[in-house]
Amino acid sequence: NVYPAEVENIIYRLPQVAEVAVIGVPDETWGEVGRAVAVLKVGQQISEAEIIEFCRQHIGRYKVPKSVVFVDKLPRNPAGKVVKGELRERFGAA
């Protein structure tokens, strides 16, 4: 099992990343793989490949997200918690 918070904590080490959430997406080979949904800090740039490579250097290969999607903001509920269900609806397709 891969715990999204563990992967998120690694990605948060990148100075360009303001927010990130990791969700599972269907995969024909593995059943499910990770996808990071990231918000960059204003004026910052980083590529999907750079985030994936950074993860490869810091966590086990099987935990590395297979893709990264960039968004302007993460959906949150009134308590301020990220609504991962909404992210899965928008970005959860393979």
Where are these regions (language model features)?
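AMP-binding/adenylate-forming catalytic core of the ANL superfamily
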Residues: 1-63, 72-75, 80-90
